[in-house]
Regions:
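Hydrophobic alpha-helical transmembrane segments
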Residues: 35-36
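Alpha-helical transmembrane segments and adjacent TM-loop junctions that form the membrane-embedded core
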Residues: 2-20, 39, 43, 47-203
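The first (N-terminal) embedded transmembrane alpha-helix
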Residues: 19-32
Length: 203
C-alpha cells in the first residue's frame, strides 16, 4: 500500500513524472527518426514518428496537469477538470492520423516490391526501444497507483503501446533468421513494409 498523498503532492509528482516522460520521448524520437533514415527502415522511422506524437501527447498531459490544479475563476466557474478529456480526445485524433499515414506507406511499400533493410540493425534498435518503453511504463504505472492520476495512466498506456510496437517489430524482423528459403529472401524484402502496415492496423 502506498501512503496517501495530498492533492498538491500528487500533482507535483504527476508533473515530475510527465517531465521524465517528455525527455525520454525526445531521445526516442531523435534516435528513431535518425537511425531509421540512416538504415533506410520505415518501421524504425515510424517508431520515431510515433514517439513524436507521444511527445505532443505528454506535453499536453503536462500542460493539463498544471492547468487542472488551478482554482475556478470567472471564466471557468467549475474549474479546469474538463481539460483532461479534451487532451485525451486530441491525442487519439493525432494517433489516428499517424496510423492512417503509416498504413498507406506500408501498403504502398508492399505494392512496389518491398524495402530490404539490415535486419540486425532493426532488431537491435527495437530491442533497446522496447526496454526503454518498458522501464517508463512500469515507472508510470507505479506513480499512477500512488497518485491516482488519470493523466499518468493515459501516458503509461501510450508507453505500453510503444513497447508493443517495438516487440512486434523484433518478432517480425527476426522471422528472417528462422524462415527457410525461399521464404527468407521474400520476407527480408517485405518485412519492413509489412511490419509498418501491421502496426498501423494494430495501433
Amino acid at each position: 500500500m502506498y501512503e496517501k498523498l495530498t492533492r498538491k503532492q500528487a500533482n507535483r509528482l504527476e508533473q515530475q513524472t510527465l517531465r521524465v516522460s517528455v525527455f525520454t520521448i525526445v531521445g526516442l524520437a531523435i534516435a528513431g527518426i535518425g537511425f531509421g533514415l540512416y538504415i533506410g527502415s520505415e518501421a524504425v522511422m515510424l517508431d520515431g514518428f510515433y514517439a513524436l506524437t507521444s511527445l505532443l501527447g505528454s506535453g499536453l498531459y503536462l500542460l493539463a496537469a498544471k492547468v487542472v490544479e488551478r482554482p475556478a475563476d470567472r471564466h471557468f466557474q467549475y474549474g479546469y477538470a474538463h481539460i483532461e478529456p479534451l487532451v485525451n480526445s486530441f491525442n487519439n485524433l493525432i494517433l489516428l492520423i499517424v496510423c492512417l499515414y503509416a498504413l498507406f506507406n506500408g501498403l504502398e511499400g508492399l505494392r512496389t516490391g518491398g524495402n530490404p533493410v539490415d535486419v540486425g540493425n532493426v532488431v537491435l534498435y527495437s530491442v533497446l526501444s522496447a526496454a526503454v518503453c518498458a522501464a517508463v511504463w512500469i515507472y508510470e504505472r507505479r506513480v499512477a497507483a500512488r497518485s491516482d492520476s488519470q493523466l499518468i495512466r493515459n501516458d503509461a498506456r501510450e508507453w505500453m503501446i510503444s513497447m508493443g510496437f517495438s516487440i512486434v517489430t523484433v518478432l517480425g524482423f527476426a522471422m528472417v533468421w528462422v524462415l527457410p528459403e525461399p521464404y527468407r529472401s521474400w520476407w527480408a524484402r517485405y518485412a519492413d513494409s509489412g511490419v509498418v502496415a501491421l502496426m498501423a492496423l494494430l495501433l
